[in-house]
From Swiss-Prot:
Species the sequence originates in: Influenza A virus (strain A/Ann Arbor/6/1960 H2N2)
Molecular function GO terms recorded: RNA binding; RNA-directed RNA polymerase activity
Protein task: Plays an essential role in transcription initiation and cap-stealing mechanism, in which cellular capped pre-mRNAs are used to generate primers for viral transcription. Recognizes and binds the 7-methylguanosine-containing cap of the target pre-RNA which is subsequently cleaved after 10-13 nucleotides by the viral protein PA. Plays a role in the initiation of the viral genome replication and modulates the activity of the ribonucleoprotein (RNP) complex.
Disulfide bridge partners, by residue number: none
Localization per record: Virion; Host nucleus; Host mitochondrion
Keywords, ordered alphabetically: Cap snatching, Eukaryotic host gene expression shutoff by virus, Eukaryotic host transcription shutoff by virus, Host gene expression shutoff by virus, Host mitochondrion, Host nucleus, Host-virus interaction, Inhibition of host innate immune response by virus, Inhibition of host MAVS by virus, Inhibition of host RLR pathway by virus, Inhibition of host RNA polymerase II by virus, mRNA capping, mRNA processing, Viral immunoevasion, Viral transcription, Virion
Primary localisation category: virion
UniProt entry tagged with the keyword Disulfide bond: no
Protein name, UniProt field: Polymerase basic protein 2
Domain of life according to the entry: Viruses
Length: 759
């Protein structure tokens, strides 16, 4: 009450009223701004004001027993006043200094482990090199970038489970650690953090930095991998840039880079196989990148490169809703269109069937080295604003936009026939035909486009058909801008479908991606990519195909051998022999195949002529569709090391060399593995291998029922007898052995006994 009376008294004096009304503080909005809510409105001022006080910091009461009242200089370190509203004491900033110098020492062993990302950053900066500063206009475009080097790629939910398990292992709550990476990380971190005294909350924060990819939408000119983004403030300003080479690489950037290379290789390879989608899936599932399964990386990695997105679509994952054309990512920002088929005539009077987009639409186009805004109507380019690093990049963007516009003058600019094919030798679709044509040479396109006078607009300039800049004239509708076009910021993902030929469509049926969009750029992966699929054997050239094919036969010899005798056609059709065919001269493939198949048939017919080494050596040649001919060969040619080399049908050669004493096979001097059995003895009858574990009793005995196939033998109980069909229709009586110990001798005796039983 007293206070209120006092205030009323003050207000009655005209001077008080004048001060309060003439100064801006009486603005209710301002008073509200600085007094409402818990959020500090002017942190730096508050900090300066607090630090000017004698005791701006509060501490636990126990501190008074651990710190002297005064330091060596006699300055007071803590106040006897307790903090209003809590049972803490007020201390001076000098107390912190004293504590840091004289306080108790704790073990520092866990710091580098917990603050790993910071320690690594310091190392990278220490070893990084900063080059000269250049002053120039920076074309920055906002891109979604990774701001957190050195992280694993767990989803937020997966990381949360790992953190809870590591930091609060005894807390209640359902945590299911399923993925390989979750389990590995949890185990590793639990071991690292035994007896760790750092506060659990801090540990949790730091683990989050290590486990989850953090992205921001930032203006960037130049490198976008996380080791460049962490020094963005040092390397590029509004009008300057500083050259920088990072002092180390981080696994997350390496994973991104290697994933793109693996995905491109796989999509390119799948596109030329008989069933692209099935092949692509088979390869994704059997490939490892840096020791991690590629499918696991695809599930977690947000990279939006075309080949990566095709692989994700094949796995049924959601992908970005933007589409790709000519290496640019298009995102429709307004308008809409309907599609209908239309036939058009090129300048060479060739008829093309194109899907025309009818309606007004606006797009952003973002490429590696150029960006643009495109406004178009039905088969008409209204406006194109391009920005890019150099003339070449700008030209690329203009060509793509002109083709995409489907304008008649573009189609009429075609000279000559359009017959571009993809890797599988199939004709490209009309839009990609046009694109390839003008990417090769755009002179006629630019000349025929037409030019116009331009108004002087800030930051925009015209461009002539020969790509020179101009302030007076420009190609119709085309302008070059100093400012870049931002990448589409939304990270939304949509459900898509993918067809057999790897064309990815959204739910409206618009094609978002196709193998034609996958870059042909080759690179060297940072992490080891292990392709287990036979389709990828050829990636390292003919020699690798040769070695891998023979290694595969040797590794799977037990099954191959049985198929060779019982179901050769199925064996010849195995996809593992597909890559080998590219090494055999096309003209003679069929004859070789016919010759080898006949030879094999004779081996099956004539008991005892089974020769393991020869079967292994010649088997890949039998995979081609056979041509019947009377031709005999003593050697077969394969194209490796830039020329034809010969494999001898009988005997060793530099390509195929089997050492009988060591039982080792070398292909072109490279070790291809060991054969488990000696080709001369145990395998002279293929049945010997199959009849291991059975005793041959003699000729067929009808009392034991109809003859079983070799496959059906496995169902017999120990001691049970049965007739079995072997080789070429001969039937013998066998009994399943009661003991396993004597199995080894079966192979040797089987051959002799089969002969006796048959004769």
């Amino acid at each position: 009450m007293e206070r209120i009376k006092e205030l009323r008294n003050l207000m009655s004096q005209s001077r008080t009223r004048e001060i309060l009304t003439k100064t801006t503080v009486d603005h209710m909005a301002i008073i509200k701004k600085y007094t409402s809510g818990r959020q500090e409105k002017n942190p730096s001022l508050r900090m300066k004001w607090m630090m000017a006080m004698k005791y701006p910091i509060t501490a636990d009461k126990r501190i008074t027993e651990m710190i002297p009242e005064r330091n060596e200089q006699g300055q007071t370190l803590w106040s006897k006043m307790s903090d209003a509203g809590s049972d803490r004491v007020m201390v001076s900033p000098l107390a912190v200094t004293w504590w840091n110098r004289n306080g108790p020492m704790t073990s520092t062993v866990h710091y580098p482990k917990i603050y790993k990302t910071y320690f690594e950053k310091v190392e990278r900066l220490k070893h990084g090199t900063f080059g000269p500063v250049h002053f120039r206009n920076q074309v920055k475009i906002r891109r979604r970038v990774d701001i957190n080097p050195g992280h694993a790629d767990l989803s937020a939910k997966e990381a949360q489970d790992v953190i809870m398990e590591v930091v609060f292992p005894n807390e209640v709550g359902a945590r299911i650690l399923t993925s390989e990476s979750q389990l590995t990380i949890t185990k590793e971190k639990k071991e690292e953090l035994q007896d760790c005294k750092i506060s659990p909350l801090m540990v949790a924060y730091m683990l989050e930095r290590e486990l989850v990819r953090k992205t921001r939408f930032l203006p960037v000119a130049g490198g976008t991998s996380s080791v460049y983004i962490e020094v963005l403030h040092l390397t590029q300003g509004t009008c300057w840039e500083q050259m920088y080479t990072p002092g180390g690489e981080v696994r997350n950037d390496d994973v991104d880079q290697s994933l793109i290379i693996a995905a491109r290789n796989i999509v390119r390879r799948a596109a030329v196989s008989a069933d692209p989608l099935a092949s692509l899936l088979e390869m994704c599932h059997s490939t490892q990148i840096g020791g991690t399964r590629m499918v696991d990386i695809l599930r977690q990695n947000p990279t939006e490169e075309q080949a990566v997105e095709i692989c994700k679509a094949a796995m049924g994952l959601r992908i970005s809703s933007s589409f790709s054309f000519g290496g640019f990512t298009f995102k429709r920002t307004s308008g809409s269109s309907v599609k209908r088929e239309e036939e058009v005539l090129t300048g060479n009077l060739q008829t093309l069937k194109i899907r025309v987009h009818e309606g007004y639409e606006e797009f952003t186009m973002v490429g590696k080295r150029a960006t643009a805004i495109l406004r178009k109507a039905t088969r008409r380019l209204i406006q194109l604003i391009v920005s890019g690093r150099d003339e070449q990049s700008i030209a690329e963007a203009i060509i793509v936009a002109m083709v995409f516009s489907q304008e008649d003058c573009m189609i009429k600019a075609v000279r000559g026939d359009l017959n571009f094919v993809n890797r599988a030798n199939q004709r490209l679709n009309p839009m990609h035909q046009l694109l390839r044509h003008f990417q090769k040479d755009a002179k006629v396109l630019f000349q025929n486009w037409g030019i116009e006078h331009i108004d002087n607009v800030m930051g925009m300039i015209g461009v002539l058909p020969d790509m020179t800049p101009s302030t007076e004239m420009s190609m119709r509708g085309v302008r070059v801008s100093k400012m870049g076009v931002d990448e589409y910021s939304s990270a939304e993902r949509v459900v898509v479908s993918i067809d057999r030929f790897l064309r990815v469509r959204d739910q409206r049926g618009n094609v978002l991606l196709s193998p034609e969009e996958v870059s042909e750029t080759q690179g060297t992966e940072k992490l080891t990519i292990t392709y287990s699929s036979s389709m990828m054997w050829e990636i390292n050239g003919p020699e690798s195909v040769l070695v891998n094919t023979y290694q595969w036969i040797i590794r799977n010899w037990e099954t191959v051998k049985i198929q060779w005798s019982q179901n050769p056609t199925m064996l010849y059709n195995k996809m593992e022999f597909e890559p080998f065919q590219s090494l055999v001269p096309k003209a003679i493939r069929g004859q070789y195949s016919g010759f080898v198949r006949t030879l094999f048939q004779q081996m099956r017919d004539v008991l005892g002529t089974f020769d393991t080494t020869q079967i292994i050596k010649l088997l890949p040649f039998a995979a081609a569709p056979p041509k019947q001919s009377r031709m005999q060969f003593s050697s077969l040619t394969v194209n490796v090391r830039g020329s034809g080399m010969r494999i001898l049908v009988r005997g060793n050669s530099p390509i195929f060399n089997y050492n009988k004493t060591t039982k080792r096979l070398t292909i072109l001097g490279k070790d291809a593995g060991t054969l488990t059995e000696d080709p001369d003895e145990g395998t002279s009858g293929v049945e010997s291998a199959v009849l291991r574990g059975f005793l041959i009793l003699g000729k067929e005995d009808r009392r034991y029922g109809p003859a079983l196939s070799i496959n059906e033998l496995s169902n017999l109980a120990k001691g049970e007898k049965a007739n079995v069909l072997i080789g070429q229709g001969d039937v013998v009586l066998v009994m399943k052995r009661k003991r396993n110990s004597s199995i080894l001798t079966d192979s040797q005796t089987a051959t002799k006994r089969i002969r006796m039983a048959i004769n």
